[in-house]
A protein has these predicted regions:
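N-terminal membrane-anchoring alpha-helices
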Residues: 1-14
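Soluble catalytic domains of membrane acyltransferases
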Residues: 14-128
Length: 128
């Protein structure tokens, strides 16, 4: 997580992210974030905006199984992602998500199920 949050993210976003009307998040509370998914940068920006330095918790992302392949998969795993099969969600993936919440962690779910560009109808996907 150090390389992702402290080096890669700061390189791309060091002077571009401004958090307005910041709020305090209790250290012992669970957090579920369900943002819209407009680009591949969403997870990185969210990590900067709501990650350990802000919420005292690492972001744990639920992503689709195909996203966890290759170099992208390695990067996502190191960012704190775990996969779920949208067509046939396994109990172990769901249990992992529940365990994160029970432990007071921060879970990020993109309810659209994929990147959805501006102007397109937002449709929630099954799989959770």
């Amino acid at each position: 997580m150090f390389v992702t949050q402290d080096i890669v993210l700061r390189f791309f976003f060091s002077k571009k992210i401004i958090i307005k009307n910041g709020f305090s998040i209790p250290k012992n509370s669970s957090i579920i974030l369900a943002p819209t998914h407009r680009s591949r940068w969403d997870g990185l920006v969210l990590t900067m905006a709501m990650g350990r330095r802000v919420s005292h918790k690492d972001c744990r992302f639920m992503v689709t199984k195909p996203e966890m392949r290759g170099i992208q998969g390695w990067f996502l795993k190191n960012l704190g992602c775990f996969s779920i099969n949208q067509l046939s969600p396994s109990l172990s993936a769901l249990r992992y998500a529940v365990d994160l919440i029970e432990k007071g962690e921060q879970l990020v779910v993109f309810p659209e199920g994929k990147i959805n560009k501006y102007g397109k109808k937002l449709v929630l996907k099954e799989g959770l």
